[in-house]
Amino acid sequence: MYIIIAGIGRVGYTLAKSLSEKGHDIVLIDIDKDICKKASAEIDALVINGDCTKIKTLEDAGIEDADMYIAVTGKEEVNLMSSLLAKSYGINKTIARISEIEYKDVFERLGVDVVVSPELIAANYIEKLIERPGILDLAIVGRGEAEILEFIIPEKAKVVNKKIKELGRPQDYLIIAIYDGDELKIPSGDTELKSGDRVLVLVKKDAADAIRKMFLEE
């Protein structure tokens, strides 16, 4: 995939490095010459020193051929303007970073496909872990309508030694994976839950607390 990333801060740098290592064609844009020089030496990407709100800069980056445009500079107005410019070239997907969550609806109404806030994501993640005692990790999916919970089944939990099909027909959750030691298994209805199993469950947001209790409480 051909991806243009505007802004070589912490988010842009990390994202570009990860995507380039996975074989994507990356173009980086930043207005700071020293930052561009450093990124050029460390990331397998075309690095352009320029203003991403200028048409010439975007065209130099090959905006006409890009599959995705990601604006993660530290300035929301720059991210919005450059994303809308990219959109005018018919690009398939634009992603823009914001810091103030109240701008999210505005960005989306104006045509930015995906609006993200690293600060808000981090805050939500910590809040969810606090709200879900016993959960090792979680991921918010489906535009916030669902979560993937990761937990270890306690020794005296009610589900220990039960087969998944014995838990009843799931309405609001799905067990998607179980770690038996270091081995990842995709479970079936006949899979037996054991004490110490590390389990990943996809669950509707509103049912997350009830499902957590079902698997963890004695």
Swiss-Prot record:
Pfam families: TrkA_C (PF02080), TrkA_N (PF02254). Residues 1-116 form the RCK N-terminal domain. One of its GO terms (cellular component) is plasma membrane. The keyword Cell inner membrane does not apply. PROSITE patterns: RCK_C (PS51202), RCK_N (PS51201). Keywords: Ion transport, NAD, Potassium, Potassium transport, Transport. Residues 136-217 form the RCK C-terminal domain. GO terms for molecular function: potassium ion transmembrane transporter activity. The keyword Lipid metabolism does not apply. NAD(+) binds at G7, I8, G9, R10, V11, D30, D51, T73, G74, R97. Coiled coil: none annotated. PANTHER family: POTASSIUM CHANNEL PROTEIN 2-RELATED-RELATED (PTHR43833), TRK SYSTEM POTASSIUM UPTAKE PROTEIN TRKA (PTHR43833:SF5). Homotetramer. Dimer of dimers. The RCK N-terminal domain binds NAD and possibly other effectors. This is expected to cause a conformation change that regulates potassium transport. Part of a potassium transport system. This is Trk system potassium uptake protein TrkA homolog. The lineage of its organism: Archaea, Methanobacteriati, Methanobacteriota, Methanomada group, Methanococci.
